[in-house]
């Protein structure tokens, strides 16, 4: 936001309408194909509304991405809290199922394509967004969980283990979904993949069951 004053309810409602319209357009027609005038036409807003609230089209996109990232974070957190006193395997499985379901939705692939398109942005919108939103990345849920365990190895390596587990769940599948439109996993495939990853993560190759 350009102003330090708290926006009025009317302004906030208008910004939410702009974000909702922009999200729908980005997902259905692609980021590059949509102009601010397209968003204004359907949202009933104005250029000043967008510039005052989001500064630019890129700013608007990353505001939307911020909202989605927070929504996914809270969704995964709530799923893991449902079995707060569960075993390590149960917690990892619950986290894994919620996490992988998100990345096997068309919306996640569409956003992945847009994010890739921002890599060469000279204004570093993507880099700045990543730097400023680390706290909303889902691996933090696992990192905090690992830090609470009695196992000293988990405590010491909590962040590395959390990032590794998320990477094992997501890659290379999400990259292939984004880059070459590889098929998304169905529910059965998601469950099987999570079970496989949890097994290897907890037991290693030698200790894993065939």
What are these model-predicted stretches?
Residues 17, 21, 25-59, 63-64:
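Helix-turn-helix
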Residues 1-13, 209-210:
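N-terminal intrinsically disordered/low-complexity leader segments
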Residues 147-199:
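Hydrophobic/aromatic-rich alpha-helical bundle segments in the mid-to-C-terminal region
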Residues 103-126, 174-181:
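Amphipathic alpha-helical segments used for helix-helix packing
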Residues 90, 101, 110, 123-151, ...:
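Amphipathic alpha-helical packing segments from all-alpha helical-bundle domains
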């Amino acid at each position: 936001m350009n102003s330090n004053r708290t926006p009025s309810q009317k302004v906030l409602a208008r910004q939410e309408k702009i974000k909702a319209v922009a999200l729908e357009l980005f997902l259905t027609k692609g980021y590059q194909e949509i102009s601010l005038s397209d968003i204004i036409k359907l949202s009933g807003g104005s250029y000043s509304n967008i510039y005052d609230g989001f500064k630019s089209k890129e700013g608007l996109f990353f505001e939307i991405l911020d909202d989605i990232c927070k929504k996914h974070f809270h969704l995964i957190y709530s799923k893991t809290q449902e079995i707060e006193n569960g075993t390590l395997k149960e917690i990892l499985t619950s986290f894994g199922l919620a996490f992988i379901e998100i990345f096997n939705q068309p919306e996640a692939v569409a956003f992945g394509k847009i994010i890739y398109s921002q890599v060469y942005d000279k204004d570093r919108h993507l880099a700045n967004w990543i730097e400023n939103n680390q706290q909303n990345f889902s691996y933090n849920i696992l990192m905090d969980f690992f830090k609470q365990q009695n196992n000293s190895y988990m405590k010491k390596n909590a962040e590395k283990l959390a990032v590794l587990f998320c990477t094992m769940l997501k890659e290379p599948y999400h990259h292939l979904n984004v880059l070459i439109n590889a098929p998304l996993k169905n529910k059965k495939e998601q469950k099987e993949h999570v079970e496989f990853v949890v097994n290897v993560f907890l037991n290693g190759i030698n200790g894993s069951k065939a």
